């Protein structure tokens, strides 16, 4: 924003300081700061490593708190000192100092708005790595091709975001596209940023597979779940699962491995199926598949608890999973629109090249 006077600058600098302090208090960040101090002291105690499991948990919790608090620490002092800086500069330069302070105010305000969005990610799961699954709906080649387009869109987004990712399972489509894909995504607030992608993504375009060049509508479901810590107890009975092993193969039929190292686990009571084939070792693929199953079962338990709470409180909210969240229209006009936030853009090419951060941020603002 353009600041027009010294009086206005003094007012908005104090408002920014107050907003920061209010948000700090609302999010109980002082308590988190004390917890981080306590965990740091524990981590520095050499006797801690006599118990490797406790040491691992302390280190993990410390790292998670640092991820949450470091962005606030980075900007905290600048915002708290800004009103004093304004007073000193204006005393020295008068109205001539408004310009340089205005740009600094805009920088701090922008950083604070980013922090407010991170403040919406207050659940412990939001800090976790994520599993992202892409599954085409009915429609054969059309929807399978759309699934592969979304796979590319997400991997481009991860690259721009600086997230690490691995394609842990993929099934080639019939002639084009993919029948299924699962990604493991690691980065700050990976699940928190990606959880809003849960739902059905709709594509409208002139089909490249239709000789008559007719317009087709395709649907793909995206499911995101957090990776769950080992200390969270999710019981999986041997009698409830079926484990299948098979030979790995990549999208487009590309041969990946010559041994039956890929693992698929079916949890029969829930109907959940997970698979992993990116490792050469069957044991590693099995471990990853069990992590995915654990994440899905944990999520299922959370959903049941949420539904029970809504039932008791007399509330019933729309279920996001299974609902159409976003449309990507390539014909007769260019438009990508999120139906939850009404955020939209006509630059379809940029979105398909991974420019989905504005959609993700718009969704986080609704939380």
UniProtKB/Swiss-Prot annotation:
<dbReference type="InterPro" id="IPR000352">
    <property type="entry name" value="Pep_chain_release_fac_I"/>
</dbReference>
<comment type="function">
    <text>Peptide chain release factor 2 directs the termination of translation in response to the peptide chain termination codons UGA and UAA.</text>
</comment>
<dbReference type="GO" id="GO:0016149">
    <property type="term" value="F:translation release factor activity, codon specific"/>
</dbReference>
<dbReference type="InterPro" id="IPR005139">
    <property type="entry name" value="PCRF"/>
</dbReference>
<keyword id="KW-0488">Methylation</keyword>
<dbReference type="InterPro" id="IPR004374">
    <property type="entry name" value="PrfB"/>
</dbReference>
<dbReference type="GO" id="GO:0005737">
    <property type="term" value="C:cytoplasm"/>
</dbReference>
<keyword id="KW-0963">Cytoplasm</keyword>
<dbReference type="Pfam" id="PF00472">
    <property type="entry name" value="RF-1"/>
</dbReference>
<protein>
    <recommendedName>
        <fullName>Peptide chain release factor 2</fullName>
    </recommendedName>
</protein>
<feature type="modified residue" description="N5-methylglutamine">
    <location>
        <position position="254"/>
    </location>
</feature>
<dbReference type="InterPro" id="IPR045853">
    <property type="entry name" value="Pep_chain_release_fac_I_sf"/>
</dbReference>
<keyword id="KW-0648">Protein biosynthesis</keyword>
<dbReference type="Pfam" id="PF03462">
    <property type="entry name" value="PCRF"/>
</dbReference>
<comment type="similarity">
    <text>Belongs to the prokaryotic/mitochondrial release factor family.</text>
</comment>
């Amino acid at each position: 924003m353009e600041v027009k006077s010294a009086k206005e600058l003094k007012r908005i600098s104090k408002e920014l300081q107050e907003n920061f302090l209010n948000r700090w208090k609302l999010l109980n960040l002082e308590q988190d700061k004390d917890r981080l101090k306590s965990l740091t002291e524990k981590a520095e105690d050499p006797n801690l490593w006599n118990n490797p499991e406790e040491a691992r948990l302390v280190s993990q919790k410390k790292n998670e708190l640092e991820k949450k608090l470091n962005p606030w620490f980075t900007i905290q002092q600048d915002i708290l000192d800004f009103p004093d800086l304004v007073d000193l500069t204006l005393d020295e330069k008068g109205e001539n100092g408004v310009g340089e302070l205005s740009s600094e105010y805009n920088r701090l305000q922008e950083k604070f708005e980013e922090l407010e969005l991170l403040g919406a990610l207050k659940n412990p799961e939001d800090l976790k790595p994520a599993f992202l699954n892409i599954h085409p709906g009915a429609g054969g080649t059309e929807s399978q091709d759309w699934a592969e387009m979304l796979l590319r869109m997400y991997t481009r987004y991860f690259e721009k975001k600086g997230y690490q990712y691995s394609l842990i399972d993929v099934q080639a489509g019939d002639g084009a596209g993919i029948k299924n894909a699962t990604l493991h995504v690691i980065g700050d607030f990976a699940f928190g940023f990606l959880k809003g992608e849960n739902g059905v993504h709709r594509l409208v375009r002139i089909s490249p597979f239709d000789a008559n060049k007719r317009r087709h509508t395709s649907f793909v479901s995206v499911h995101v779940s957090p990776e769950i810590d080992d200390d969270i107890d999710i019981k999986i009975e041997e009698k409830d699962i079926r484990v299948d092993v098979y030979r790995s193969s990549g999208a487009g039929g590309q041969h990946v491995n010559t041994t039956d190292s890929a693992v698929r686990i079916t949890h029969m009571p829930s109907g959940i199926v997970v698979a992993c084939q990116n490792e050469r070792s069957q044991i590693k693929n099995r471990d990853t598949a069990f992590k995915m199953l654990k994440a899905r079962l944990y999520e299922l338990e959370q959903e049941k608890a949420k539904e029970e709470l809504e039932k008791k409180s007399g509330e019933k909210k729309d279920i996001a999973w299974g609902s159409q969240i976003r449309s990507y229209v390539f014909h007769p006009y260019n438009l990508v629109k999120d139906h939850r936030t009404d955020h939209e853009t006509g630059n379809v090419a940029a979105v398909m090249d991974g420019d989905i951060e504005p959609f993700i941020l718009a969704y986080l603002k609704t939380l």
